[in-house]
Amino acid sequence: PIMAGFAEVDSGRVGYRHRAPTLGEHQASFDGEPFPVPAARSEPADLPLAGLRVIDFGHGGVGVECGRMLAEYGADVVKVESWSYPDFIRIVLGGVMTASFASSSRSKRGFGADLKHPDGREVVLDLVRGADIVIENNSTGTMDALGLGYRHLREVRPELIMVSSQLMGSRGEFSGWTGYGPTLQTVGGLSWLWAFDDGDPPPGSPAIHPDHLAGRVCAVFALAGLLGRNRGGGGNHTEVAQVEALLGTLGDVLLKEGLEPGSVRPRGNDSPRGAPWGVFECAGEEEW
């Protein structure tokens, strides 16, 4: 078994369209002459996404990461929050303006509105009328409950590109699960792979993977949606389930287990790249 893609666009799975290359099939591309490097410009060029307007309803990791990437490539990203439901990255370290928030939302503009009040909703809809992209990674059903789901937003902006990301997707028996990267590592199988093959529970990890991965997948599909729109395809809605972004990175593991059941085991400090692989005590005092 292999993953059938990382996302759905307008409820259609976007998967692989071509076979995998054979060994050495594209070797000539690597052995050929390198592409010439253009001479440096005397004046700095505009950033590639300059002129695009993005409305960012992101919280925590995925949506916030996607918006930051688009902003740093020149898009005008407006981050929408409310005092009732601020981006939890603001407060996770015990303050309204923390280093983690300043880092994750750099290059953006901030905007506050009460999305549950009719006036606040109308103000946000006015923003959307002039937007190219909307990003959100709220719990399943939140945007629809606020009257700001894709079906609502496309009424005021038919050419809108919207990207949504939920932990387990927006449909199915697990769609109501809420959480972020660390809560997904267990159900996605990553914690088990990181464990030692000794029967003890997985040790856990402070890494917020796959939040940043899923955020980058969202950014790629946002740009793909823009390309499709510019070619006459109109607006579209992409959904990226975080769990599928994680499983997509484990494709080789899933394929191996499918071909050789029972062959995949927790890796601990083992690595297919070399042996020994780990942290070892060396001669001397506190030398490793």
Give a label for each model feature.
Residues 18, 260-288:
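Alpha-helical interface/anchor segments and their boundary "cap" residues
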Residues 1-17:
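A glycine-rich dinucleotide-binding beta-alpha-beta segment and adjacent secondary-structure elements
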Residues 232-248:
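Polar, surface-exposed loop/tail segments
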Residues 4, 97-99, 179, 274-277:
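Short beta-strand-initiation
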Residues 9-13, 130-136, 282-285:
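Short, surface-exposed connector motifs at secondary-structure boundaries
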Residues 18, 22-237, 257, 261-266:
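N-terminal helix-loop segment corresponding to the beta1-alpha1 unit
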Residues 84, 167-169, 242-247, 284-286:
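Glycine-rich beta-alpha junction loops
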